[in-house]
């Protein structure tokens, strides 16, 4: 059953992410003006003014999710390698970011402010992408509905059994949803229902990859996860791609 944001954490507590996070990045820290004060981030500028923009959103703050989450860092690196102006940041109350957890409402505002910030450095960006992991995938999909410049998304383990995704009516952009077959937190069946619903909509194409044996953290299947991401980006970023 889908539930609203306020009831998520008490009904469906996430496992802790902290043990699966990398150590602090050596990239320069950036401070972004957010709705409740500063937001801590890491930013990789692009080599050219019209380069595309990408932003990656981390898992649930109350479960130890941060911008140093392993999957977040891998997504960050793959966009950076492709020449994107790439940002990852901590939601309010995480790390050096000011504020307190706001059940998704404030976090969506954080994401909007962060995207404004990165776009200010690349106002002529050719395209914008959003990627999110678990809770971050839910926030990212909401941001997608509010920002028409977002042309693609990567959603890893979107918590379709915990949060209401009916706001995607219609979903304005094509993207990929990636799920672990052995995910003990986000049930594959709930994600499949979300995919099936999105695929009934016109003018978008939804890819869906299921990674065999992978749990919610993809701790033993990171290579397979990133291969799925890279294959999708190869296809979407090809000038001859049928998906725009």
Describe the function of each predicted region.
Residues 11-49:
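N-terminal cap/lid segment of alpha/beta-hydrolase-fold proteins
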Residues 47-84, 88:
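Short, surface-exposed "cap/lid" segments of acyl-processing enzymes
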Residues 122-133:
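Alpha/beta-hydrolase fold nucleophile elbow
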Residues 132-140:
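Gly/Ala-rich beta-loop-alpha elbow adjacent to hydrolase catalytic centers
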Residues 184-190:
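Conserved alpha/beta-hydrolase "acid-adjacent" motif
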Residues 101-121:
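Alpha/beta-hydrolase active-site loop
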Residues 198-217:
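Catalytic histidine neighborhood in serine/cysteine hydrolases
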């Amino acid at each position: 059953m889908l539930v609203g944001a306020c009831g998520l954490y008490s009904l469906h507590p996430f496992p802790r992410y902290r043990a699966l996070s990398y150590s602090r990045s050596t990239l320069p820290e950036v401070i972004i003006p957010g709705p409740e004060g500063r937001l801590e981030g890491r930013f990789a500028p692009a080599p050219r003014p019209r380069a595309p923009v990408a932003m990656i959103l981390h898992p649930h703050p109350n479960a130890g999710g941060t911008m140093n989450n392993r999957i977040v860092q891998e997504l960050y690196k793959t966009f950076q390698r492709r020449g994107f102006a790439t940002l990852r940041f901590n939601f309010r109350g995480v790390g050096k970011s000011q504020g307190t957890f706001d059940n998704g409402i404030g976090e969506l505002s954080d994401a909007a402010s962060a995207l404004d910030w990165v776009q200010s450095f690349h106002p002529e960006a050719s395209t914008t992408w959003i990627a999110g992991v678990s809770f971050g995938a839910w926030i990212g999909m909401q941001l997608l509905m509010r920002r028409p410049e977002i042309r693609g998304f990567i959603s890893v383990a979107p918590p379709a059994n915990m949060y209401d995704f009916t706001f995607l009516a219609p979903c304005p952009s094509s993207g990929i949803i990636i799920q672990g077959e052995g995910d003990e937190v986000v049930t594959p069946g709930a994600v499949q229902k979300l995919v099936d619903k999105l695929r009934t909509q016109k003018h978008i194409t939804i890819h869906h990859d299921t990674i065999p044996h992978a749990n919610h953290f993809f701790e033993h299947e990171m290579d397979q996860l990133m291969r799925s991401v890279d294959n999708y980006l190869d296809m979407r970023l090809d000038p001859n791609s049928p998906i725009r």
